[in-house]
Amino acid sequence: MYLYRESIFGAAYSLALSVGQRNLGALAADTWFRIDVEPRTYDIRCTTPEASDSRSIQIASGETRFVEAAIRMGFVAPRCAVFEVAPEKGRSAVVVGKRAQEIH
């Protein structure tokens, strides 16, 4: 599974990203994480100081999924959103981005 952020909107802010109980770390603009996962349903969550958003993504054996995390306009601080995207869109964003440092 690839989780990425590509927009320059809100570039001064990073957003925290987690998959289930696993905290991956922060995504800045044009960065991505790649994680190996077992087939099942995963709760993907992004968090900013003002809000959070989550989506459930089901992954079958052998599938590669792409999930975009995006900054959205907030009242005082930015908000975030996560959503699955088509493989073509996800691959093109990952190719031009940089791998983010995952928290261990």
Residue ranges and their predicted role:
Residues 1-104:
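Short loop/turn and low-complexity linker motifs enriched in small/turn-promoting residues
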